[in-house]
Amino acid sequence: MIYTVTFNPSLDYIIDVEHIKLGLVNRTVREIIYPGGKGINVSIVLKNLGFDSTALGFLAGFTGADIRTRLETMGVKSDFIEVSDGMSRINMKIRSDEETEINGMGPAIGSADIDKLYDKLDKLKEGDVLVLAGSIPSVMPGTMYSDIMKRLEGRGIDIAVDATRDLLMNVLPYHPFVIKPNNHELGEIFDVELRTRDEVIPYAKKLQEKGARNVIVSMAGEGAVMVAEDGTEYKSEAPKGKVVNSVGAGDSMVAGFIAGYLSTKDYEQAFRMGVCTGSASAFSEQLATKAEVDALLAATYK
């Protein structure tokens, strides 16, 4: 079974406004609302690709109830923990002459809530896959993901981590199955600027030396690279298409890689699946569908 964890789920509210004017009443010309959060995005894309998962995390208030309902409508299973203090956040993206994002705070997650999450994670079994994705609330320690991995260490659970900075670096001693920084995040870790696939590879290997089994680095229009646990290096140009909405593209890459690996047990095929799934989401207003991914696979890797 696949499980995803999202510490701070959201309702993502995207509005289009023609020539927004601050300080005045503006009217939208288009609105979209959908459940958000990196782990949730992974679960949605996995479902689109034909793989069931269970979305874990924390919900609160009427917004939390709406997130749960929307996921149920999509056919995504969930087992969220209800938090009593606050409400799940609303993240607003205003698209006009420029794009502006306003992100909500989210509920107050206490130690008792964390213990409930641990209780759920303790039930995972050998062969399960766990995805830890996204940021955590600022009140939580930067060891949150590594604490989870330490707790599950030695149980045969493959753990994917999509996080940044300390949250990512702290998990490396526990040998995550796959990590997926982008080239900018990777550069920030080592205080360098990484622009090309060849420049990225040595630094991806440094993360592998620190403990990661497989390292994928996404590079938007420059494609992606992967260093597999057997030492093989894979490089891919970006699939051709027009970027419509890049939100969720990285999460989609993680979902595609997991789906590809579970289907084939082949790292090259899984990497290609990840690349095309990420691009398919970027080329669409919504998250990638299987038909979109299959079309990109056929067009990109002839």
Features from the language model and the residues they span:
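Gly/Ala-rich phosphate-binding loop of Rossmann-like dinucleotide-binding domains
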Residues: 47, 153, 262
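Conserved phosphate/ATP/ADP-binding segment of small-molecule kinases
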Residues: 142-230
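Short beta-strands and strand-loop turn motifs
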Residues: 101-103, 128-134, 162, 180-185
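Hydrophobic alpha-helical segments and helix pairs
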Residues: 108-123, 127-152, 158
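Conserved phosphate-binding/catalytic region of the ribokinase-like
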Residues: 197-302
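Conserved N-terminal subdomain of the carbohydrate kinase-like
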Residues: 24, 48-128, 295-302
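Glycine-rich phosphate/adenosyl-contacting loop at the front of the ribokinase-like
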Residues: 1-56, 64-66
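Hydrophobic anchor at the start of a short beta-strand
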Residues: 2, 51-54, 78-79, 159, ...
